[in-house]
């Protein structure tokens, strides 16, 4: 969440006329991230997030905002889009679609432990099941077709070894995506970007017996319909790794995956292709980070991510991937 489009006080005052949210108390840009312009907005009626969508179109946006509303209605803690005075969930600001959503309670946990991974695993499975009857369909826009389109633009900037890995893994994933087993994998709406900084935790009540309480998932603007296992792989590749080496932390990975299975057990096809999907999840973010690093857009507040992080993860997943952990029936 960077700031590509600046919003002045007069811009904000004009925009807020379309909302019944009271008077503005505070407003500031959010510097992290790379896709949209985001701002914390505090009014006399509560705390919110204003997002200006830099790439998503008005035709694409209903998928994301309606998905958040659908999930919230099924008990999944996500930001709730705030309707404007005309009932619409978004409008136009500086010629771009923009929306206001409620701000979740809690803070990101950037050094998660087993207890955090358990909470994330269970809620991710609940989210997947809650999305099964969501009527809108839109593919993950950062999947295989996007890789195939953008890798050629990246390869002039990278080393020979990196080019070999980019092109070799792309061929591997194209074969996997074209297989009968891939077609048989279950799926539906996925977050597709459930990193540590897109999940909030709040203090658990003393009488719950839990050390932490999940506050919610947010930043659904990379969401799309995909295989659920891809969403799990993306999550594990961030929540359950040594950040310096990319090596999986077995304790955290097992905790997240076992917790997920208490809600939705994995299929035989998913178990066979866990390695392929972990590689796909790493490849997706390596490609996008390379693209943003070498072909950046202008932004007022932009902190590009290190592409080497996901290169290390991809190489590690190719070399070593444990099987999905089993779970006893009694734990279901």
From Swiss-Prot:
InterPro entries: Aminoglycoside_PTrfase (IPR002575), Homoserine_kinase_II (IPR005280), Kinase-like_dom_sf (IPR011009), Pseudomonas-type_ThrB (IPR050249). It is an enzyme of class 2 (transferase). Its EC number is 2.7.1.39. SUPFAM superfamilies: Protein kinase-like (PK-like). Transmembrane segments: none annotated. It comes from the Bacteria. GO terms for molecular function: ATP binding; homoserine kinase activity. The keyword Glycosyltransferase does not apply. It catalyses: L-homoserine + ATP = O-phospho-L-homoserine + ADP + H(+). Keywords: Amino-acid biosynthesis, ATP-binding, Kinase, Nucleotide-binding, Threonine biosynthesis, Transferase. The keyword Protein biosynthesis does not apply. One of its GO terms (biological process) is threonine biosynthetic process. Pathway: Amino-acid biosynthesis; L-threonine biosynthesis; L-threonine from L-aspartate: step 4/5. Belongs to the pseudomonas-type ThrB family. PANTHER family: AMINOGLYCOSIDE PHOSPHOTRANSFERASE DOMAIN-CONTAINING PROTEIN, AMINOGLYCOSIDE PHOSPHOTRANSFERASE DOMAIN-CONTAINING PROTEIN-RELATED. This is Homoserine kinase. The lineage of its organism: Bacteria, Pseudomonadati, Pseudomonadota, Betaproteobacteria, Burkholderiales. The gene is thrB.
